[in-house]
From Swiss-Prot:
Pathway: Metabolic intermediate biosynthesis; (R)-mevalonate biosynthesis; (R)-mevalonate from acetyl-CoA: step 2/3. It catalyses: acetoacetyl-CoA + acetyl-CoA + H2O = (3S)-3-hydroxy-3-methylglutaryl-CoA + CoA + H(+). The active site is at residues 84, 116, 246. This enzyme condenses acetyl-CoA with acetoacetyl-CoA to form HMG-CoA, which is the substrate for HMG-CoA reductase. Pfam families: HMG_CoA_synt_C (PF08540), HMG_CoA_synt_N (PF01154). (3S)-3-hydroxy-3-methylglutaryl-CoA binds at residues 33, 116, 158, 208, 246, 255, 325, 359. InterPro entries: HMG_CoA_synt_AS, HMG_CoA_synt_C_dom, HMG_CoA_synth_N, HMG_CoA_synthase_euk, Thiolase-like. One of its GO terms (biological process) is sterol biosynthetic process. CDD domains: init_cond_enzymes. This is Hydroxymethylglutaryl-CoA synthase 1. It comes from the Eukaryota. Its EC number is 2.3.3.10. It comes from Blattella germanica.
Amino acid sequence: MWPSDVGIVALELIFPSQYVDQVDLEVYDNVSAGKYTVGLGQARMGFCTDREDINSLCLTVVSRLMERWSIPYSQIGRLEVGTETLLDKSKSVKTVLMQLFKDNTDIEGVDTVNACYGGTSALFNAISWVESSSWDGRYALVVAGDIAVYAKGSARPTGGAGAVAMLVGANAPLVFDRGVRSSHMQHAYDFYKPDLSSLYPTVDGKLSIQCYLSALDHCYQLYCSKIQKQLGEKFDIERLDAVLFHAPYCKLVQKSLARLVLNDFVRASEEERTTKYSSLEALKGVKLEDTYFDREVEKAVMTYSKNMFEEKTKPSLLLANQVGNMYTPSLYGGLVSLLVSKSAQELAGKRVALFSYGSGLASSMFSLRISSDASAKSSLQRLVSNLSHIKPQLDLRHKVSPEEFAQTMETREHNHHKAPYTPEGSIDVLFPGTWYLESVDSLYRRSYKQVPG
């Protein structure tokens, strides 16, 4: 018998203390007004100086979660990190995090890598561990973190950075639905990092969008099929209270929500198409695989789903809009955004679907139920209260000019694998409690310190 109500007990999320404004970036890049803000749906982009790397981000988010929630480090029995920001081809980020755990060395797990999907894989592994015969009663800790950077050009505004830590255990306020998880895995060269000496990926933008939408189709169809068997009745998007997506940029998320409506329309009965989907009648007979770049179809389903998007998905886009694409934490930044957008009473009892995508490609759709107990001392109320700092902290960030941002990117590009190396970035602008890179010695050994506070 597995433990009851396995899910997310606690959440912590961090983002860089500086950002560049996308309006300023449009002017600096000499592109049309609205290209980044309207076309991509992005407002601000967080970024790291050379003082922060994937190790420091993960050190910060883990120490913050443990302190805020007063969790003894001895209570962690599994720790797994999902990331695609690799500093070492052998040594895992998880092993770097072990310096926080002092005498507790009995901790399973290492790193999981596949583009933006690694955090989800780590989460699934954590759930499986808690539900397995290997579980020893302690918590599993899942960390997802990345620094998303692109070379100069049209993709650079879709960068971002951040990390999330999720404490997984029994009797959780966010409980994962069992038996409905669906996955789609496929070989594709849509986005990959074959040049190990470079910070930047190789990207086929059009193929990447096609792969994302195709994976979404497959996962949603399978998810609906599985949950219909459990419920014994038809299931569509209207049965979900919130739908969260991996967010490369916000406009793609809006298109993705509309894509689920298109899926529902395609598999609807003739009667439903006439009554429920009358405004989409012109789409009768369309094949999903022919519609990835069909502007007319896209416009029709986006118009139809506009109110649905506002209700079910837009509340999850705060961090995607204000920080950018955090890669592996992106989807879970959506979950945090949802949790800080409403009160515990408004969230109680809701079912949330999540779509995770990582290029190459790996994808899954799964769902969770939010506890119906929103009383003053409930685990849900505590979870929401312990995320109340997120919105105010976004406003405490330091705004940086596009020129300084470009110079920072150049510094990172030239020095990211240099040894010995002493970072140039200022420590003064970092948030209190932030871990930062102090130095890299001649043997590439990295040393870290923590900002007081």
